Structures are given as structure tokens and as C-alpha cells.
Amino acid sequence: MSRFQPYLTEAQENDLRRIAQAICAPGKGILAADESTATMGKRLQQIGVENNEENRRLYRQLLFSADHKLAENISGVILFEETLHQKSDDGKTLPTLLAERNIIPGIKVDKGVVPLAGTDNETTTQGLDDLASRCAEYWRLGCRFAKWRCVLKISSHTPSYLAMLENANVLARYASICQQNGLVPIVEPEVLPDGDHDLLTAQRVTEQVLAFVYKALADHHVYLEGTLLKPNMVTAGQACKKAYTPQENALATVRALQRTVPPAVPGITFLSGGQSELDATKNLNEINKIPGPKPWALTFSFGRALQASVLATWKGKKENVHAAQEELLKLAKANGAAAVGKFEGNMGTTLGDKSLFVANHAY
């Protein structure tokens, strides 16, 4: 009997690797449209639109029915479960709109954060119990990748050893289950930007968290070539009194990744973490311009930083749909350029430099 029992066939590994590589193709990234019903409610409230299923459907239809040019810079979209079953005005399922544009549908599979007992307001993420059966069903409905978010906070005594260990193991269990069911797992250990910590502290904590994550992924025999990482960019805390340049943020980010992320991982798809549309894009651009070894694609998996101007333009009005879609195309093109280090510094969107920070952000 072999000491190591493979849990994936060669064909399964090939499929996972192919999907992961397609998602992080040069100049392409992910639109994170997986906001929960409650979070969508907050976004719709900001533009004076009622949070009901029809308005959520109309908004997501707006996103997914944009011009086919969207696929030049968006390779995948993360969906919320409700969206899987919603249909466009002409009767097509919303994931079908994506497939018609050669955009890969993905799905958020975690069930939110819950308190981690024995810690100071730290959390773990729930949703493992029925994950295998849900993943099998999501694959049947056309999804080819998944996302699971864990959250860690920086303070004088957090993240704790327990929180880092627990969240890393949860992410590894999730990743293993996804792969067994044909879904590429996006591993998201978000270190929140809340706090007054400086850039070096953010870098060191990010390194610590990622080290825990990749140890757990190895322990659980996760096939790294069939995964993607969705980390925070390394930035100082929102309340830090010192301002750092995009170049300083980029250098700290790349150093943290070089020290912790194996080269077998095909791509790193950064979250925007409440940065303004312009700041997130500038930071991504500078990350790609940093010299030195970067063996992974460095691209985006943005939610707010790809949608804020879209929502502000739409305002829930049918006559604004085309203009809102044009905002989405501008944002996608700008971030596609940033993903190869060629963003020119201006995207011309409605809310380009407006901060999108939400304290203690929950999806």
C-alpha cells in the first residue's frame, strides 16, 4: 500500500489546473458579485432602491448582460447562491449570460463568520457541514470555482495563534472538498484594514497568516496548481496617521507573498478591501511593476472597487442601465491594464477616488 493516497485523479487535476489558469489569464481578473442579501441591501439603500429580489435580479442582470467586451478583462464572476437561480428578462439564467460571454461562473460557498470561543472577538467561518453536496450541485449548475472567506483582525494581541490555526484549517478543509467536486477553490484569508497599525505590522501579520494557510493546505493534500489565493493587499490600517505611497504598499505586498506563497499557485487575485476604485487599481498596477521574482499571476477579485460607480450611475432606473454598464467596462479595462502593470492613472469613473471602507466588513 502506498504511503500517499491520491484523492484526485490525473484528469481531475488537469481540469482544476486548466480552470485556475484561465481565471488568471494575462490582463483578466474576477468580478466579485457575491454580496449576501443583507449586504446588497446596504448597497441598494445608498442609492435609494428597495432591497427586494426583483431589484437584486435587475442589478445583477445589468452586470452580466454588459457588452461582450467585458470578457476581455473579466474571466470569472463570483455569484451568491440566489443569483444561480435568477433569470434575465428573456428567460435565461443569469449564469447563462456569463457563459455566453465566455466568463466562468463561480460561487460563494461559506455561510459567514461566527465567534471563535476563547478569543477576543475573533471569528471562524461556518459552512463545512454540507459543503460536499452543495459543491456537487453548484458544479451541475455550471459553476467551476468557489470562494470561502475567513477574516482576521490586527490589534496589539490579534490575530491570535488559535484564530490563525483554526481559520487556516477551515480554508484547507474547504479547498479539499471543492477540489474533490470539480471546483477550483479560491482561498481568502482576509486581514482586515481596520485599526491604526503601520505598513510593516500589516506586512508581518499577512506573512504570518499566509504561512499558517499554506501549512494547512499542505497538511490536507490540497492540489496547489488547482487553487487561487485571494489575499488583502498589504496596506496600513485605516486609522494609521502615516500615509504610504502605492509603491510602498506594493513592495510590502510582494515581499509578504514572496516569503509565503509557493510558486505552484497559479494566481493571486487580490481583494480590494474598501479601497477607492482608483487606489485599488493603482496599488495593483504598482504590485505588477515591482521587479524581482513573481511566479504567480497578480490580478484582481474586486467587489466594491468594480461596482461602486456602477451602482451610483444606475440608481435603480432602467434608463441608466447602459451608462452603468459603461462604468463597469471602464473599471474592468482599467484593472485589466493594472494586472499587467500598464494602468495609466485615470479611469474617469463616477466614484473613482471615493473611499469604500466599511468597518469590520462582513459579506
Swiss-Prot record:
Its EC number is 4.1.2.13. Substrate binds at residues 56, 147. It is an enzyme of class 4 (lyase). Keywords: Glycolysis, Lyase, Schiff base. GO terms for biological process: glycolytic process. The active site is at residues 188, 230. It catalyses: beta-D-fructose 1,6-bisphosphate = D-glyceraldehyde 3-phosphate + dihydroxyacetone phosphate. It holds the Pfam family Glycolytic. GO terms for molecular function: fructose-bisphosphate aldolase activity. The keyword Lyase applies. The record marks 363 as: Necessary for preference for fructose 1,6-bisphosphate over fructose 1-phosphate. It comes from the Eukaryota. Pathway: Carbohydrate degradation; glycolysis; D-glyceraldehyde 3-phosphate and glycerone phosphate from D-glucose: step 4/4. The keyword Lyase applies. PROSITE patterns: ALDOLASE_CLASS_I. Belongs to the class I fructose-bisphosphate aldolase family. This is Fructose-bisphosphate aldolase.
